[in-house]
C-alpha cells in the first residue's frame, strides 16, 4: 500500500479518456449530494453568503460550472502544485513496529523530491457590516432554517477560552435528548420538528456557530427563528446550570475516548 501511494504522489499520469467519465461521476455526485438535497443546498449557499473573501465561500467539490469547464490540464497543474512530501502527512495506526514503519517510509517516500509550494495568502475576512439573509428555493416538504455567526477558531489550546465555551454551548443546546433545543422547542413548545446547534473549533479560517431546524406543522420559519434566538438569550441572561455543564463536559470527554475504539477514529484524530 505504501509503495502504491508513494508512486501516486510522484508519478501520477492523468489520461483524457479516463478523465471524462470520472468527471461525470463527480458531477453526478454533486447532483445527488447537493443539488437534489435541500439541506445541503442551504448550507452551500449559507457559506457562499457568510464568507466574502475566504475560500470557504466555495464548495469543496466545486460549483457545477467549475466541473463543466474543468480540463485534464487543470487537474494535472493542481497535482503538480500541491502533491509533494513537504505538503503531506503520513499517518499509520494499528499493530505496527515503528522501526519497520520508519524504514518503509524512508524507502518509498525518501526519494521523492520536495518542491516550492504556492504561496498561502492571509485568509482575512472583511468586516461584516450587517445581517445577511438568503432564501433558497428548492423542493421540500417542510421549510428549513439555518443561522450562522462568525466566531473564533481554536488557535492556542492553552490560552484560548472562547472556542471551548462555544463547544460547551453547542452541547448544552444540542448535545443529547435532554438538551435545551430538544426539550424546549421540540417536545415542550412543539414549535420545531427538529432543532440543532453546531460548532467546529479546528479550522484554518474563521469558524461558524450554527443553529438550524425545521418548524413543526402549523408554525413558521419566523417563529422558529424567534424561538432559537430566545434560547440563546436565556443563556446570555441566566447562564447554564452546574448540572448541564457537568453533563456536557462528561459527554465531550467520553466522545474523545470513544474515538479510540476504531482505527479510523484514531487516524482521523491524529
Describe every region a protein language model picked out.
Residues 76-80, 132-136, 195-201:
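Short beta-strand/turn micro-motifs at beta-sheet edges
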Residues 1-40, 54-55, 66-87, 97-100, ...:
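Active-site-adjacent, His/Asp/Glu-enriched structural segments that form or flank metal-binding
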Residues 52, 60, 89-155, 259-260:
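An aromatic/glycine/proline-enriched structural segment found at the starts
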Residues 158-173, 182-183:
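Active/ligand-binding-proximal structured segments within catalytic/core domains
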